[in-house]
Amino acid sequence: MKKADRIYYGGDYNPDQWDEATIAEDMRLFKKAGINLLTLPVFSWAKLEPDEGVYDFEWLDKIIDQIWANGIYVCLATPTTAQPAWLSTRYPEVLPVDIQGRKRTHGMRVFFCVNSLKYRERAAAIAEEFAKRYAHHPALAMWHVSNEYGTYCYCPTCQAKFRLWLRKRYGSVQELNNRWHTTFWGRILTSFEEVTLPTELNDDYRFNPAIQLDYMRFVTDSTAECFLNEYRVLKKYNPEIPIQTNMSGYIKKLDQSELTKNLDVVGWDNYPWPDDPPYFVAMKHDIMRGLKGGQSYVLTEQSPNQQNWQPYNRLKRPGEVRLLSYQAMAHGADTCLFFQMRQSIDGQEKFHG
C-alpha cells in the first residue's frame, strides 16, 4: 500500500491561495526539508466545480504534476467538506438543522447534512471526476475523503431516516417502547411516526439517554454511509490505493470504532489543548492504533505552532513539535503531517500555525 520507502512527512497544502512564484519557492523549500507527501485540495470544491456539472481541473493538474516533478507524493482529498455556495443556494436541503431547530446558512465547512441525497449525489460526482483523472497518477499515494466528519443534523430528512433506522433496529414499536422504557413519564409510542429527534425543542438530548444514544448511533451509521458514497467511487477506478478520512481525535460525536471499519487506514488530527497532560495525548494515539487491530495509522494533522480555535492558543515551546511527532511515531503512526504547509494569508484559519 505504501509507495515511499520511509515515513510520509508533509501536510496540507492549499496552492489555490498562492501565485506561481510562491508555489515554485514552496517546492524548493519542501525538497530542502525532506517533504515527501502533500495533502490537497481539501477545501477547493468551489474552484473545481464552479457550477453544477462544470469542472475545472486544469490548475490542479498543473500543481500535481509540479509536485511529482519534485519527487513528492500526494494524498488527494475529495473537497466535499466545503460545498460550493451554488449547491447550498440551489439545494438548501443540503444544509443542516441544528439542535435548536434552526436551519444553518452557507459558510462553515462541514456544514452539510450527511443524509441529504442531493449532497451525496454531487459529492459522488466530483469524487468520480477525481478518480477518472488521478486514480493511476504516479504521484497518488492515498485518497483522503472529505474532512473531519461530525456534523449533527435534525432536518426532516434525518427525522424520516431516524424512524426507518429504528424500525430496522427494533422491528416493532413494542420492542422500541421496551428498550427505551417509555412507560416512565408517559412516553409510550403507538407508531414509529411518533418518534422525534432529541433536540432542545423536547429536551430529550438531555433527559432521555436511550433516545440520545440511539440518535448518536444513527448519526454514526449515516456518516459511514456518506463516507462510503465516495469510497466506492474511488475504489472502482483503482482498488490498490488506500483510502482514509481524518478524525478529530478523542470525540464522542461519532463511534469511531464503527466508522473506521470502512477505512483502509486510520487517520486522525492531533491538536492537544494547553492543559492536556501528556498521557491523554498518548491515550488518543493508542485508541487510533487499536481501531484497526494494531495497524499503523496516519497522523493527518498537527499544528506547527499555535491553533486558532481554542480559548487559549499558546505558541509551542522550542522542540515541542518534534516531541509530539516522535510521540505519534512511537505509538504507531507511519505518517507525520501538518496543517498547513504555508500559513494562510487570510481567511478563517489565518492564525492557525
What kind of region is each of these model predictions?
Residues 1-22:
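Boundary/entry segment of secreted carbohydrate-active catalytic domains
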Residues 4-9, 34-36, 68-74, 136-141, ...:
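Short, well-ordered coil/turn segments that N-cap beta-strands
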Residues 11, 30, 38, 67, ...:
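Conserved, mostly hydrophobic/aromatic
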Residues 24-104, 128-131, 229-237:
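Aromatic-lined substrate-binding rim segments of carbohydrate-active enzymes
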Residues 44-58, 86-117, 157-159, 206-212, ...:
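Surface-exposed, active-site-proximal loop segments in enzymatic domains
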Residues 100-265, 269-283:
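Polysaccharide-binding and catalytic clefts of secreted carbohydrate-active enzymes
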Residues 105, 244-353:
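Hydrophobic targeting/anchoring helices
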